[in-house]
Amino acid sequence: MFQARGSMSRRGILAGGAAMAGTLAMPHVAKAQVPRLRYATGGGLGANEIVTIHLMDWMKDNVLKRHGKDYVLDVTYTRGTPEAASLLAAGQADFATLSLPAFATAIAKNAVPGGMKIVADNFQDAREGYASQVFYVLDDSSIKTIPDLKGKTIAVNAFGTAVDLLLRVALKKNGLDPRRDVRIVEISFPSIGAAIREKRVDCGVLPLPFGATERAKGGLRAVFQGKDALPPYAVIFQVATENFLKAQPAVAKAWLADYVAGLQWLYALENRKKAVELAATLSKSPPEVVDSYFLTKNDYFRDPNACLGAEQVQPPLDAMVAEGLLSARIDAKPYVDMSFLPRPCSA
């Protein structure tokens, strides 16, 4: 009797072990079957590219409910949107954060096989009552207005970026030739504040979070901002290759549903402490500085449903033609597709 029970126990153990082995193996099989979404960031962190907060492990584990089930993110952190556009063109990314100039240049060159679409907002500039892209000088500088920049050295993060375009439009509107009347240099965003203070440049652009951090130190003042050059416009946004949208529409929708859910989670007042903590950690900024602007009217405007219209995309496109950065006008409408978002956008 004992032996029979023992024999049955051994069989039970073997059967149970096999079942357990199968059970343990199942997550690996399921994980391998979860579609991969390759995302290239645009070089920003925190407020100036809020999707980078979504990409943090804490957000993926606690807020992005579809991650690991309907899709898995494979992220490449780039130095700027031109690099992100290059990854799309090379077939090494499915989604990316692009600036308007990087997007327009890729469209004009037909660089991305199969084409690409703008599928979600990131943030917009020149919205009344919200933060803007700001160019700063030293408090004691003789530069008071845009015309005073003649003969001066001005820093942007990279040529061909959104802030570079903004600068050129502002200069031209005030009678200055960007090619002859000023010297424009490339300096990374985190280093522009020091470059102004050390007088290596006379003026420089400091988007969030860098502008807030430098303002807190004192000694700088604004000369002009985005709304002085352009009407409300899209600065950066999410794009996806048309090949990916056609091959994996459910994956695209799952990611964008999580993106919108994450955006609304960040803005919810009950989550503010954690949201500020995440943004401060990511941007390596003091929490009290982040708390002074992040997700308030001192921050950039973001549509709560990530909606973006062609009317916010067209002005910079037209400005690029006027500045000779595009040889022909691009109509934004065919390239804006909000249908992959979880809720319809109003017309």
Where are the predicted features?
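N-terminal secretory signal peptides
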Residues: 1-8, 19-22
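Short, glycine-/small- and polar/acidic-enriched structural segments
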Residues: 33-177, 183-186, 202-208, 232
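Pocket-lining segment of extracytoplasmic ligand-binding domains
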Residues: 190-281
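Sec/Tat signal peptide C-region and signal peptidase I cleavage site
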Residues: 28-32
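Secondary-structure end/capping motifs
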Residues: 246-327
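Conserved C-terminal helix/tail region of periplasmic/extracytoplasmic solute-binding proteins
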Residues: 317-347
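Twin-arginine (Tat) signal peptide motif
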Residues: 4-14, 27
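Stable alpha-helical elements in mature extracytoplasmic
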Residues: 84, 99-102, 145, 163-166, ...
